Regions:
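N-terminal glycine-rich phosphate/adenylate-binding segment common to multiple enzyme folds
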Residues: 49-158, 244
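Glycine-rich phosphate/nucleotide-binding loop
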Residues: 45-48, 229-329
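Short acidic loop-to-helix transition motifs that present clustered carboxylates
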Residues: 113-115, 220-227
């Protein structure tokens, strides 16, 4: 039985980088007899130009009926003056809501060949392989809020943070299951010395952990975790945390690799999940054929790992990327004298030959 993968290239370099990832998926599909089918749909500014909306209903329905979605990037200065409700970025929010995406996964792995690109010293960053699991649809971002009110004669604004036990259960269960396939360690991050929601988070996490005696659970305050990511990132395996803390920590950790062009991500849904690079649409280099496709190729590996449970095929892609880098291939965002300068096509071919 075939598996349907919906491709949403989006804007800017989105088409180029998703084309690269699809080429890799097709080759790995042939190698492992995965029987993948691909279907492309518009979103973002491109969709707005075509249909007058950043997320056509046909695109959303196709995504909802797919086994997985591979997403490029959206946005660009061309649409800066579009009505706010029709901005390209609204496509991402619509997909999150329409697919019920509740967990964001951000793997931070520093390839041996790229250690020198990290802002941290080699002895600190080498061996870093962290998976940050961020709760995506709860917490302060989605709580009640007030932009402005007068209280005791002064203007104030407020945002309400809340989490329920089922929301915490779901995200912590996911983190525990992910850790079972890695190094059996979960670090739960909160601010339970100050916040009531964090105290509920910590109590609930402890109860979930009782079902996983093989998993080592540690709890860290978010400020300590932020510091530890900078001074000893290799100590972590899986980090699980709420929406706000996860947003901040995942962006901090992204710096460790030295280039956002290397970092994939996944947003996990109840039935369909979405995979995308963390970088933007880079309209300044769109159409030039020089974009780094590796984050999108690694997002495709995550798709195989988490949506299709094709662990061997996912590892094959990840190892092919490592081998291409070890051979010295570098796109312009990573190029230094002494390496092989590669455009998008050349880098993709360098990965393909190792599959």
């Amino acid at each position: 039985m075939s598996k349907k993968i919906v491709i949403i290239p989006g804007d800017g370099i989105g088409q180029e980088i998703t084309d690269s990832a699809v080429a890799v998926l097709k080759k790995v599909s042939d190698k492992y007899n995965l029987n993948l089918e691909f279907e492309s749909h518009p979103a973002g500014g491109t969709a707005y130009d075509l249909c007058g909306t950043p997320l056509p209903q046909t695109t959303l329905e196709a995504a909802q009926n797919a086994d997985a979605v591979l997403f490029g990037a959206v946005g660009g200065p061309k649409w800066d003056n579009v009505e706010p409700t029709l901005r390209p970025e609204k496509a991402v929010l619509g997909l999150r809501k329409g697919l019920g995406l509740y967990a964001n996964l951000r793997p931070i792995k520093v390839a041996d060949a790229l250690v020198e690109y990290s802002p941290l010293k080699e002895e600190i960053v080498k061996g870093t392989d962290v998976l940050i699991v961020r709760e995506l649809i709860g917490g302060i971002y989605f709580g009640d809020k007030c932009e402005s009110e007068i209280y005791e004669g002064n203007e104030r604004a407020w945002d309400l943070e809340n989490y329920s036990v089922p929301e915490v259960n779901r995200i912590v269960e996911f983190a525990m299951q992910a850790a079972k396939k890695r190094k059996n360690k979960v670090t739960s991050v909160d601010k339970s010395n100050v916040l009531a929601t964090s105290r509920l988070w910590r109590r609930t996490t402890a109860k979930v952990a009782e079902k996983y005696p093989e998993i080592t659970l540690e709890n860290l305050y978010v400020d300590n975790c932020a510091m530890q990511l900078a001074i000893n990132p290799s100590q972590f395996d899986v980090i699980v945390t709420g929406n706000l803390f996860g947003d901040i920590l995942s962006d901090e950790a992204a710096v460790l690799s030295g280039s956002i062009g290397m970092l994939p991500s996944a947003s996990i849904g109840k039935s369909t999940s979405l995979y995308e690079p963390i970088h933007g649409s880079a309209p300044d280099i769109a159409g030039k054929g020089i974009a780094n496709p590796l984050a999108t190729i690694l997002s495709a590996a995550m798709l195989l790992r988490y949506s299709l449970d094709e662990q061997e095929a996912a590892t094959c892609i990840e190892q092919a990327v490592d081998k291409a880098l070890a051979q010295g291939y570098r796109t312009p965002d990573l190029y230094k004298e002494g390496f092989i300068k590669a455009d998008t096509k050349t880098m993709t071919e360098a990965v393909l030959k190792h599959i």
